[in-house]
């Protein structure tokens, strides 16, 4: 997701709460070794109206990596050569381009990446085959509806837009939202892949904040990210972060147990 404020891309183990290392067998029956981490998932920017496909893969050092969709069509083929090929790669993350719904409708997007079992195959430096199977779901969590100190999220953060409605508040600042319980309700948006909406299980929430500051005459973007368990629906912004200025942008992201994630963006100004 190319956020309007260049969101921190959080692919850390903390964000995903990964426990695959302890849940996968050491060696499969056919001597193929599974990747220690293997995830393919969707990310929806509900504010901008765009979808992208992401993957996070980690394991033994490899020189070749391929991904096949449920129809056995190859969607990724990476071969490492030269000195890097001799060194090998381990952790690998990608995110696709994310055209707006005007350019690529969500219906076409989900047809392009069907739900089902995706095979991730690789070749280790010593020639050993690596393989994992992952499930990709079209179930997207409904967008969070955040409040800043009890005030509904601003819908338009561009000062030049006639609908500019930035939230004006004072410290301390608490961002809260109701628990996300269902999948996306919009059949022409993030819910295009699954209708009617179904119940979801939230894996975690994430709040990202950003402010542009001037440091010795140069503009600098300060960011912070906070990850909460599924029962956490409230964050008090650290006073040290708020002390940097007055105009802040923020994002609240809901990550489902299938790792699909839906984010909304907004803003607030301190009095």
Located regions from the model:
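Surface-exposed, short loops/turns at beta-strand junctions within beta-sandwich domains
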Residues: 108-115, 239-246
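Extracellular fibronectin type III
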Residues: 130-133, 255-271
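Proline/serine/threonine-rich low-complexity linkers at boundaries of modular beta-sandwich domains
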Residues: 132-153
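Long, polar/Ser/Thr-enriched low-complexity segments
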Residues: 28-107, 115, 119
């Amino acid at each position: 997701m190319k956020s309007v404020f260049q969101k921190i891309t959080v692919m850390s183990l903390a964000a995903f709460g990964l426990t695959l290392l302890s849940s996968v067998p050491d060696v499969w029956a056919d001597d193929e070794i599974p990747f220690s981490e293997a995830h393919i998932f969707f990310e929806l920017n509900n504010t901008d109206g765009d979808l992208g496909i992401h993957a996070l893969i980690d394991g033994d050092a490899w020189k070749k990596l391929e991904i096949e969709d449920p129809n056995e069509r190859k969607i990724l083929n990476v071969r490492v050569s030269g000195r890097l090929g001799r060194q090998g790669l381990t952790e690998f993350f990608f995110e696709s381009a994310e055209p707006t719904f005007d350019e690529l409708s969500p219906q076409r997007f989900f047809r392009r990446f069907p739900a089902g079992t995706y095979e991730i195959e690789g070749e280790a430096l010593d020639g050993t085959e690596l393989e994992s199977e992952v499930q990709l779901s079209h179930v997207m969590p409904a967008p969070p509806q955040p409040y800043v100190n009890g005030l509904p999220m601003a819908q338009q953060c561009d000062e030049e837009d006639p609908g500019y409605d930035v939230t004006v508040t004072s410290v301390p600042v608490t961002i809260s939202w109701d628990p996300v319980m269902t999948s996306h309700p919009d059949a022409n948006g993030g819910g295009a892949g699954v209708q009617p909406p179904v119940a979801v299980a939230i894996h975690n929430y994430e709040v990202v904040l950003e402010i542009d500051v001037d440091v010795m005459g140069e503009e600098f973007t300060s960011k912070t990210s906070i990850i909460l368990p599924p029962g956490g629906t409230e964050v008090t912004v650290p006073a040290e972060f708020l002390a940097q200025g007055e105009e802040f942008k923020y994002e609240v992201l809901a990550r489902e147990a299938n790792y699909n994630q839906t984010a909304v963006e907004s803003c607030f100004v301190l009095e």
